[in-house]
Every structure is written in C-alpha cells, then in structure tokens.
Amino acid sequence: MLADYAFIGVFFIGAVIFPLVPLVAAYFLGPKRPTPIKLDTYECGLEAVGDIRVQFKIQYYLYALAFVIFDIEVVFLYPWAVAYGQIGLFALIAMAIFLVILVGGLVYEWKKGALEWV
C-alpha cells in the first residue's frame, strides 16, 4: 500500500531539491564582495530618479487578488468543460455550486465597495 504512493514522496523530495541545488551552488560559488554599485538600486538600467520607495494604493492589491481568484476559476472550469460529456450530471451540480460560491464572493466584494476605484 505504501509503495503505491512512493512516487509522491519522490516527487516531493525532487520538488524540494530541484530549486535548492542552484541556490546553494550560487551561495558557495558566487563572489562574496558586494561593491557599492551592487548595493545601489537598479531601475531598468537607468539611474534611479526621485524617491525609490513608492507606496501603492491598496486598490491595486484588491484588483490583483480578484483577478487571481477569477483566473483560478477559469483554470478549474476549463478541464470541467472539456470532460463534461463524460462526467455527467454530478459534475454539473458540483461546478454550479462552485460558481455560485464564487459569484457570491464577487457580489460581496461589490457590496463592500472593494471594486470601487477611489
């Protein structure tokens, strides 16, 4: 029984090791002498002009979060739409519940004024 799921453990270990190897190699093999130029702020290859720290309005964050939520919705809808003929009525009901929950969240955001641009 445990051997059937061994590939998940191997996949997890590989998923941890794969990004760590280049990071550890860069740490040990890379130069350790930061110069003032390396510590300077980089802005598209040009000298930084004005204040480097710019505060963004929270509305950008809310719009980005709403975009990600509804983008993930499309990721879930696409495979369902492709396999709809094979999975039947239960999948239709499950997806309808999923969409009702997401639309309910959108209506809640709208009523709270999160989508109003100020």
Curated annotation (Swiss-Prot):
Signal sequence bounds: none
Molecular function terms from GO: NADH dehydrogenase (ubiquinone) activity; NADH:ubiquinone reductase (non-electrogenic) activity; quinone binding
Subcellular location: Cell membrane
Enzyme Commission code(s) on record: 7.1.1.-
Top-level division of the source organism's lineage: Bacteria
Summary of the function given for this chain in its UniProt record: NDH-1 shuttles electrons from NADH, via FMN and iron-sulfur (Fe-S) centers, to quinones in the respiratory chain. The immediate electron acceptor for the enzyme in this species is believed to be ubiquinone. Couples the redox reaction to proton translocation (for every two electrons transferred, four hydrogen ions are translocated across the cytoplasmic membrane), and thus conserves the redox energy in a proton gradient.
Assembly: NDH-1 is composed of 14 different subunits. Subunits NuoA, H, J, K, L, M, N constitute the membrane sector of the complex.
Name of the protein this chain belongs to: NADH-quinone oxidoreductase subunit A
Gene behind this protein: nuoA
